[in-house]
């Protein structure tokens, strides 16, 4: 890891994550969590990996279907201090709804290390990106059973293999249980040992609501935390990589809600007690997309929590200067979350070497608060490359445009995303890509244009300062994408969640990207338009905020009906479950959908009935 730049580390984490979720891990789960991901978190806390649900690997079909309900990730804590802060957030929310703090109830369950899925009773989906996943219903058709012979349709859970069974019958053939779990899901026919594991009920789907639990009042959790963790970790004969804690009180969960990635009323605890005293060999400056210089600390190779650590982040040069983190320093090191190397404190300070010039463009650096910064934003190679790669990463509907590809394009005078979209196969071959690779890259560019993305994601991909995904969505809830470049400071500052300082930054940011935005926008991206808040507030129809499924042949285009439904505040799903409110039927409806609706108590209405209610 010591040879990796920030961008390369992020790319490696993405590759490792995809390989892990595809059932072909290239490093252990602990190494990923506590070495690489933690290093990335320390170097680049705003990286996309920490803001969005981790997607599964490309081993699954690229054809994705809408999940019956969103499957969020779980926030993680690696110490009692972080759990304590989570409890304080619970208590703060409880006070806001006048809930007695002594009445807060907590549930703890084992955090399974399997393949996440959602079972709606008729289909099984992978988690995918949390909104769309792959249909892997074939795994039930192959005979997979639900844990404890429970019924189908119990929602989110994981496909797992019993630890004792894996150790006895499968460890000689598979390096990790995930490799075997993946073989159950793949489209190819099952081999004999996989089929036997299913028959023996060693491989199972476990709905989370069927997991054994500890439950009690929050005061008991505080008093017996270590004991409860130890108890929960051994509750099941499956691979477990932590303990999930969640509030039980329904009104408290509603109050706390969720962000894009996880529910705030839930957290997963992972523990790492290993520490080491390590000598610093070097401190190397690296340039990020925004021009911030991150000090990368090279360390004497040290075995920690089963992995050899050779690198950690110094966060910023202000901290390096304050701590005396220089060549020859001795630091106390741990693996935060059992994955990422983290310097706890400097035991032996040494003189530090503060760089004067940017390591990428050699221009003088300036201090901005605790950060050394390269302000040569338009011409610094590292920043230009980082911004181009960032566009494709945020857009998230393409493959192939990682740092290595972008660096090669930069070496052949490509300096902007709009220049990339103007390339053809012949151009790429001339640059030095193979013909097949060139064809794939062009196909991915076309895919990024045709495959629908949210308009706020498209805007965020341009990488304006302070305009991440959340702020871009907030802006587009008040003004349409086509109108934002005409907004003045007052109009932006008046948006809820913004203020004058943020407004000034946004105005300048929009000016800086306007030309590039127009060049790229002309390619006709398939953008999903954000509904304006003022329009949502005028929606008073009976089906507002209800979940519906359309089925059968309609008088209107099914796609048009879905788009219209979403535009007026209706949540559209693709399959029947207990979470659905209405099934809207046209002609030639399959009886299975009708029976599923009856089974789950879903109200059935005709297309005419539906139109009359909106």
From Swiss-Prot:
Report which residue ranges the record marks as coiled coil.
Answer: none
The UniProt keywords, alphabetically, are: DNA damage, DNA repair, DNA replication, Ligase, Magnesium, Manganese, Metal-binding, NAD, Zinc
Residues that bind Zn(2+), according to the entry? 358, 361, 374, 380
Top-level taxon of origin:
Bacteria
User: What is the E.C. number?
Assistant: 6.5.1.2
| One GO-annotated biological process of the protein | DNA repair
Task: Name the cofactor(s) required for activity, per the record.
Answer: Mg(2+); Mn(2+)
Cite the BRCT domain residue spans from the record: 538-614
Where is the chain membrane-spanning?
Answer: none
Q: Where is the active site?
A: 111 (n6-amp-lysine intermediate)
Extract one GO molecular function annotation from the record.
DNA ligase (NAD+) activity
Q: Where does NAD(+) bind?
A: 29-33, 73-74, 127, 158, 270
Q: Name one Pfam family in it.
A: BRCT
Query: Which top EC class is named for this enzyme in its record?
Result: ligase
Q: Which reaction does it catalyse?
A: NAD(+) + (deoxyribonucleotide)n-3'-hydroxyl + 5'-phospho-(deoxyribonucleotide)m = (deoxyribonucleotide)n+m + AMP + beta-nicotinamide D-nucleotide
As for what it does, the entry says: DNA ligase that catalyzes the formation of phosphodiester linkages between 5'-phosphoryl and 3'-hydroxyl groups in double-stranded DNA using NAD as a coenzyme and as the energy source for the reaction. It is essential for DNA replication and repair of damaged DNA.
Q: Which family does it belong to?
A: Belongs to the NAD-dependent DNA ligase family. LigA subfamily.
Protein name as annotated:
DNA ligase
